[in-house]
Design a protein with these regions (language model features):
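A short, acidic, amphipathic alpha-helical segment used as a generic capping/interface helix at domain edges
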Residues: 36-47
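Glycine-centered helix-coil hinge/cap
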Residues: 41, 97, 171-175
Length: 214
């Protein structure tokens, strides 16, 4: 993914993307963009032109120690290095402008962790049934990103990644279902602090296409 020596050296300089370090994190991870391998830059180019709708990078070079499974959520803030976050930052800034939402603690990166003792729970912190990656921000009602990046730091060789285009799925729904999606009957949370919700449709037409609002 990176030119080995220079890229790894720059990744070791990445500061925390959390709690007021956004500017330094963006600056240092932007420098990593210069060290992306030509194959990676080619993939990013195809994403920006729309030739690719999605792409899964594998064998990302990380040397940091994976932290132990936490006992609480959110877990204590991790200590350096922040190589995984640097990879996200460099790819994100190659695609455009990286940003975070106020409702996600104003962090640039929203972390999902498994929590010890909740392996079988019906929540996103379980790990034995499914560790759910929340990408709610990709359906934000006010500020919709062009790309959503998901990074799995604990890769399971036996896991299965399922990728589907929601627009293709919606086209297969019965008409009575899609008609309902056009009605303003759906409650959207637009802010958690202070709490604020609005009623909007999930579905709308744009140049005869069917974008999904949420």
């Amino acid at each position: 993914m990176f030119f080995a020596s220079h890229g790894q050296k720059q990744l070791s300089r990445i500061p925390s993307p959390y709690c007021g370090n956004a500017e330094q994190f963006l600056f240092q991870s932007k420098l990593c963009c210069n060290h992306l391998a030509s194959e990676t830059k080619n993939v990013i180019q195809k994403l920006t032109t729309g030739e690719y709708n999605h792409y899964q990078f594998t064998d990302i070079p990380l040397t940091e120690t994976v932290p132990p499974t936490p006992h609480t959520y959110p877990p204590p803030e991790k200590i350096p290095p922040y190589q995984a976050e640097g990879v996200i930052g460099s790819v994100a800034q190659s695609l455009g402008r990286m940003f975070g939402y106020r409702e996600n603690c104003q962090h640039l990166i929203y972390d999902i962790y498994p929590v010890r003792g909740y392996e079988q729970s019906s929540s996103f912190i379980n790990s034995r049934k499914m560790l759910g990656f929340h990408s709610d921000g990709s359906a934000h009602t006010k500020l919709i990103p062009d790309y959503t990046l998901l990074f799995c730091i604990r890769s399971d060789p036996n896991s299965i990644n399922l990728i589907a285009d929601v627009k293709n799925i919606v086209r297969k729904l019965p008409k009575w279902v899609t008609d309902e999606l056009f009605e303003p009957h759906f409650l959207h949370t637009v802010s958690q602090n202070p709490a604020r919700t609005i009623l909007k449709p999930i579905h709308f037409l744009e140049e005869e296409q069917h974008p999904i609002t949420y």
